[in-house]
Amino acid sequence: MSKEKIVLAYSGGLDTSIILKWLQTERNYDVVCFTADLGQGDEVEEARVKALNTGAVAAYALDLREEFVRDYVFPMMRSSALYEGYYLLGTSIARPLIAKKMVEIAEKEGAVAISHGATGKGNDQVRFEMSAYALKPDIVTVAPWRDWDFQGRADLEAFAREHGIPVPTTKKDPWSMDANMLHISYEGGPLEDPWTEPPTHMFKLTVNPEDAPSEAEYVEIEYVNGDPVSINGEQLSPAALLTKANEIAGRHGVGRIDLVENRFVGMKSRGVYETPGGTLLYHARRAVESLTLDREVLHQRDALGPKYAELVYNGFWFAPEREALQVYFDHVAKSVTGTARLKLYKGNCIVAGRKAERSLYDKDLVSFEAGGDYNQHDAGAFIKLNSLRMRVQKRVEDKGKK
């Protein structure tokens, strides 16, 4: 009798190799492995070969870099979303694409279930499984970290040795890392103390601001209909553009954030993030928007952005409310066409100029010189009418004191 198949999100590391063997031996599945290339820098073909050598019946390694940036990162950026005011959602936005590909592979392979290596305390388990259920409601999800009986790292390594899985002998960094084209996140180990400063050697994408060049660098980023299309006049594909933005901002130490965030599962956690290119694009986009978006549209968009960020963070990418908000943000983004010039210097990203063909900024209108559509004499009536409710409120309060 043939075994049922399960699709595993496989990184090639020790933990997912153990999960692969555990799914075979303890759950009696034929395991199909899937490794996504999201620009994390790992050798995905090596992971595919390792999966087959570890016992997978099939293994996929897919280059998703362009799709990731074009269909997930850039649409998210149109909202100017920041989770809790800081986080550019680098890990959160990668999970729905991985889940989507897992479901597609499951359908192709006739698999009945999917599995992942996310722990039972984090957000990723929610993001993977919510996305999968939204796309394939009857899919079975297996989360080994919630299910197995291993009590700690020693038990995991003993299981690995028992089944011929190589256990690294070199000492690992005491923190966990998750990387893709948009960012690298660091959690755990010494970072669990929110008073402890991250060690300088931890960072991979950005130089320490103190060690950045002593001369500022200027960069120009052009936007068309809400998305960046060129850097310093060079037209680039979405993935190539983000890669270049990472390189430019990273060498100036731009894009580090350190925050204590509220996880969807109910606890607070400390995360340290490097998002050099994303930070550069965020400031460039806002500079162009300051010229091209109507005041009320801009304020409304910014009011909706935190909700959108929350939906992405909590795993609701494929939910109808996120898709409805996306329609609004995409419509607003049609007005965001122009160029921003930014100055990068020792961890700082400073707007140094912006221009747009359809700019709403009217230099003549804001000039102190007379003329134009604005009559300063009208301002008195404008102020008086807008203060009416406060004047009424004050009169009522004064009457109550008598």
Swiss-Prot record:
It is found in: Cytoplasm. Keywords: Amino-acid biosynthesis, Arginine biosynthesis, ATP-binding, Cytoplasm, Ligase, Nucleotide-binding. It is an enzyme of class 6 (ligase). SUPFAM superfamilies: Adenine nucleotide alpha hydrolases-like, Argininosuccinate synthetase, C-terminal domain. The keyword Transmembrane does not apply. ATP binds at residues 9-17, 36, 117. L-aspartate binds at residues 119, 123-124. Gene3D superfamilies: Argininosuccinate synthetase, chain A, domain 2, HUPs. Its EC number is 6.3.4.5. GO terms for molecular function: argininosuccinate synthase activity; ATP binding. NCBIfam families: argG, PRK00509.1. This is Argininosuccinate synthase. It comes from Deinococcus radiodurans (strain ATCC 13939 / DSM 20539 / JCM 16871 / CCUG 27074 / LMG 4051 / NBRC 15346 / NCIMB 9279 / VKM B-1422 / R1). The gene is argG.
